[in-house]
Amino acid sequence: MINPDNNDLYDLNEALKVENLTINDYEEICKRLKRKPNRTELGMFGVMWSEHCCYRNSKPLLSNFPTKGKNILVGPGENAGVIDVGNNQKLVFKIESHNHPSAIEPFQGAATGVGGILRDIFTMGARPIAVLNSLRFGNLDKTSNMDLLRGVVSGIAHYGNCVGVPTVGGEIDFDDSYSGNPLVNVMALGLLETNEIVCSGAKNVGSPVLYVGNTTGRDGVGGASFASSELTITSLDDRPAVQVGDPFIEKSLIEACLDAFKTGDVIAAQDMGAAGLTCSSAEMAANGNLGISIDLDLVPSREDNMSSYQYLLSESQERMLFVVKEEKINNLIEKFNKWGLYANVIGEVIETNEVIISHKRKIVAQIPTSALSDDTPVNLHNVMKNPPNYLLKKWKWNENNLPEINEQKIFSLKENKSFSYSEIILKLLANPSIASKRWIYKQYDSQVQANTVFKPGESDAAVIRLREQNEKNKSKVFSGVAASVDCNSRWVSLDPFRGTIAAVAESARNVSCVGAEPVAITNNLNFSSPETEIGYWQLSSSCNAISEACKALETPVTGGNVSLYNESKNRDNEITPINPTPVIGMVGKIDNVEKAISTEWKNINDQIWLIGSHKSETTIAASSYLEYFHGEITGRPPKIDLQDEKFCQSFLRNAILNNFVVSSHDISDGGLAIALAECCILSAKGATIELEKDLNRDDNVLFSEGGSRIIFSIDKMKEKEWSNYLKKIQINSQSNVYVKKIGYVSSEILKIKIQDKNICDISVEELTEKFNNSISGYF
């Protein structure tokens, strides 16, 4: 037992405030320990009982996710999910957030976000093969938002480029709700290199516990608690809670760990991420149903006179904790030292289910593992039965609220003047949320490792060739994986359930658009405080939607991250919550990457087709057009029929597999007109399009948004075969689904007619100039 005389004297109220604990939490801690905690133990409980580590507000909602499927090898509970992608290959993947650190130290916050998610991947025995990111910032007309964007992109680029993992795709959106609280979500993928998946549960009493990697300092102390609280005007004072990363040590750590794992001498592995040594030791012990004892005097440190509290709560980067075979310890230490890494035995696995910490020859913490990991508190909340009144009011909006169309011009409620359709298309293309993200992704090395099939921006999803390090594939037919991150935050803010359904559907659609079969998801739930009625209702509605959509599309959840309290408070204590942003990271598999297709048109006179669903709604309510042209964020997002969504995606994949489709692009932000323009821009080719008239308004035809819609082009040399194929599969007998030709690829001009009426006539050069120079124009 811990000696009561070792308990620190501390101000309880102040300590609880620092650790973000309540007096009820403290009483529960005393009950679990059967005594009062000392200051070090209170800090350990503070980080382990934070939302960031134990999901105390979201755990009941997450339990409803579908987590099993034919390709799922490892689901939630380990460092990352694992799926079978065929040919005896296993893909490891996960998404994590680093929102609060990036708000106050954008470069290091984003850089260490990349480092942390990479460690989750290679801790499982996988070589990281790709990184994607999902970013949110306030509008770029504010210098502070420009600075945050510049810092975050630089941090992601620096760490990913230096460590040698390609950044292959992502998404970014701008909205004032993120001005005080940007979102930085990073997804990583890895290909398993070990014979067995490396898990985190400690085994074999008496086995040594090995610390590997960088030294421990005071950086990042309390980072998990910091990430579980709102940002205020004084949050800049929390800069010490932001970690400092070294990608070159991370690179050595990747190679050394994979080398060590292949020996079979590592029994269990856990990276030291959030809550550092506290979390890694507690989770290893709990997952193995054993205990761990650690002597802090043996931990390599970079600073003098560190307290036990600082050792245990430090989130210094590039550190790992292993349980290893005792007879192999010297061989392993030699391997790690060869890579310039510290490798010290700092403890052992013990039989009792406790985490016991010693420092300066005294026991400074002794806590049951269940209290830190398995049996953590759950905050139960009542869920609102009905949507809030402010949303019910917005849902009543319809297109009759807009000005009438007069002589092919539309009056903008935002700018108080009329514009032609061509002018509107150009204005939408220049909006930073729709415009090219080239200024961002050109800073990333997307080609390192030489397995990236399409460069960022060229396809709806990233496609990675799966190639072992020692390639023995003589046929040169490589399978691959596709990945996409998606979320329309505007839709989720207007209807959390429908908006999240759409996020899952769009991520699967993007993967299908390159010819890959969607397999599984990881998710990053970015929300505001769950302690408000509306905040928890948004979170609950979104989780219900993920469950429903993933079941319908047969894409189970393998894990992810919950980031709550994403809101900012100004000097007047006014709280601004972010738009709820449940980012979906979808992965899919493709048997032959040579069959993967990109977005741009391929040949002049190729036919352009549209597939969609009559049951999946399309509307200009909640659309980009309504926000960016009319200045209104209102209306109810369209409902998506998930069975039709699944059918449309399957139809497209089969058409790609049968070598008919040569390009495809999903219709999302900005509607059909923007999707067509993007295909023209990427190919430097035009399109001649003729569309059916809408009963009410032509802007509905051009700019409405909804699910289940994809444009694709058919090889001009296969028109007859394509026609026979459609007859054979009787596509139009599917009463809810339509497949129709809408035009053909032409040169230099995007021409759109609606019912024989010329709507727009824009040169590809003009489209490209607006699209490519928007974001870069701010810097």
Swiss-Prot record:
Top enzyme category: ligase
Binding site for substrate: S97, H98, N99, H100, R119, Q243, E315, S316, Q317, S563
Pathway given in the UniProt record: Purine metabolism; IMP biosynthesis via de novo pathway; 5-amino-1-(5-phospho-D-ribosyl)imidazole from N(2)-formyl-N(1)-(5-phospho-D-ribosyl)glycinamide: step 1/2
UniProt cross-references to SUPFAM superfamilies, sorted A to Z: PurM C-terminal domain-like, PurM N-terminal domain-like
Residues reported in the UniProt entry to bind Mg(2+) 1: E96, N561
GO CC terms, sorted: cytoplasm
Catalysed conversion reaction: N(2)-formyl-N(1)-(5-phospho-beta-D-ribosyl)glycinamide + L-glutamine + ATP + H2O = 2-formamido-N(1)-(5-O-phospho-beta-D-ribosyl)acetamidine + L-glutamate + ADP + phosphate + H(+)
Active site, per annotation: H52, H98
EC number of this enzyme: 6.3.5.3
Pfam families: AIRS, AIRS_C, FGAR-AT_linker
Keywords of the record: ATP-binding, Cytoplasm, Ligase, Magnesium, Metal-binding, Nucleotide-binding, Purine biosynthesis
Protein localization: Cytoplasm
InterPro entries, A to Z: PRibForGlyAmidine_synth_PurL, PurL_linker, PurM-like_C_dom, PurM-like_C_sf, PurM-like_N, PurM-like_N_sf
A molecular function GO annotation: phosphoribosylformylglycinamidine synthase activity
GO BP annotation list: 'de novo' IMP biosynthetic process
Keyword Repeat: no
Binding site for Mg(2+) 2: D120, D271
Residues binding ATP: Y55, K94, N523, G560
Function recorded in the entry: Part of the phosphoribosylformylglycinamidine synthase complex involved in the purines biosynthetic pathway. Catalyzes the ATP-dependent conversion of formylglycinamide ribonucleotide (FGAR) and glutamine to yield formylglycinamidine ribonucleotide (FGAM) and glutamate. The FGAM synthase complex is composed of three subunits. PurQ produces an ammonia molecule by converting glutamine to glutamate. PurL transfers the ammonia molecule to FGAR to form FGAM in an ATP-dependent manner.
Family: Belongs to the FGAMS family.
Assembly description: Monomer. Part of the FGAM synthase complex composed of 1 PurL, 1 PurQ and 2 PurS subunits.
Protein's recorded name: Phosphoribosylformylglycinamidine synthase subunit PurL
Biological source species: Prochlorococcus marinus (strain MIT 9312)
